[in-house]
Amino acid sequence: MKHLIEMVESHKQGAENGIYAVCSAHPLVLEAAIRFARTHNAALLIEATSNQVDQFGGYTGMTPADFCGFVHQLADSLNFPRSMLILGGDHLGPNRWQHLTADDAMENAQTLIKSYVAAGFKKIHLDCSMSCEDDPIPLTDEIVATRAARLAKIAEETSDACFGESDLVYIIGTEVPVPGGAHETLSELVVTTPDAARATLEAHRHAFEQQGLSAIWPRIIGLVVQPGVEFDHTNVIDYQPEKAAALRAMVEGYDTLVFEAHSTDYQTPQALRQLVKDHFAILKVGPALTFALREALFSLAAVEEELLPMKAGSGLRHVLENVMLDRPEYWQSHYHGDGNARRLARGYSYSDRVRYYWPDSQIDDAFERLVRNLADDPIPLPLVSQYLPLQYSKVREGALKATPRELIIDHIQDILRQYHDACQRVTPHNA
């Protein structure tokens, strides 16, 4: 995958560049990302997680082939070249099947890898760090690496069979806490130590050798570590460069490797830029994008309440709350406290568990009605100013249309812009 290989090469030569990965399956988030990349003539990395998309459909109901077709169709409709689009698979391994024995879970994981690679995903995060039903807790580096190497071999064989060659790139390692934001309130995080990072790398290098995969080591371009960034429901732990100084120095000894940082959502623009400069050159973002989507929709719902009688309105927020109460499985183990605290978390938490509910047919119907209601007539500018002030200035300058979809897209793109800016290359001093 030349875009990613070239990005790493440039970074290692001192360009201080990077790439961000859009981790979302929401159509409006993906449209915002594709349009932003098209405007800036930039490659776009879109990733699906093993929770979202798997051979059984995941929580989105999509297989890897479905997701690939969905993204390609969207890109085609927006005149974005497929050659500039990179699809990645995140946390691919036994994650979804930890309740099964290791043998059964890994059998599913092998099928998962085959389905991702055959569908055309080129960036593969091998993550076998989780313990299965009959495993010790925690797993040793050797067990994790041996399982990852088995999956890498499957990936290479699948790519050769489907495409006649393999240009896959791989990410190894994992972060703590779990993907998608911490479950509990956080105060401080332990940054991965250089020794732990080296141990992960060397265990994987040895396991890959055992599988006859030494030749693909240069295509292992990223190691997931914990740089000390995370968010919980109401707080963000900001990047502190001095705590990751030893990690930064350690990765400089590897010619083809950068770090991949997960849970970078809600970091400041300055922190994002510093992460990239410190060799966390792949930045993952997901909940912050659907959080921005939710912000825009709540703002538009407030505009609708001002403009329309209640009977004619979409009732989006009411519908959303009712569905979340009727189907609490995506939030009840994450949000704690009294009734009011949980209500606030359902709507406003940084972990954005509401993102799991947007595909629901009742909520989608309310969303479509909201957009229709506000698309018939121009939204009065004072209401845009009141509820979407960041977009208001662009509307006044003539750079943005005050239509519901455009306001939503632009609000999401405000977050994407921070990541784009953080990943821009500079001219190396020795160039």
Curated annotation (Swiss-Prot):
One of its GO terms (biological process) is D-tagatose 6-phosphate catabolic process. It holds the Pfam family GatZ_KbaZ-like. One of its GO terms (cellular component) is plasma membrane. Pathway: Carbohydrate metabolism; D-tagatose 6-phosphate degradation; D-glyceraldehyde 3-phosphate and glycerone phosphate from D-tagatose 6-phosphate: step 2/2. HAMAP family: Tagatose_aldol_KbaZ (MF_01295). Component of the tagatose-1,6-bisphosphate aldolase KbaYZ that is required for full activity and stability of the Y subunit. Could have a chaperone-like function for the proper and stable folding of KbaY. When expressed alone, KbaZ does not show any aldolase activity. PANTHER family: D-TAGATOSE-1,6-BISPHOSPHATE ALDOLASE SUBUNIT KBAZ, N-ACETYLGALACTOSAMINE PERMEASE II COMPONENT-RELATED. Belongs to the GatZ/KbaZ family. KbaZ subfamily. Forms a complex with KbaY. This is D-tagatose-1,6-bisphosphate aldolase subunit KbaZ. It comes from Enterobacter sp. (strain 638).
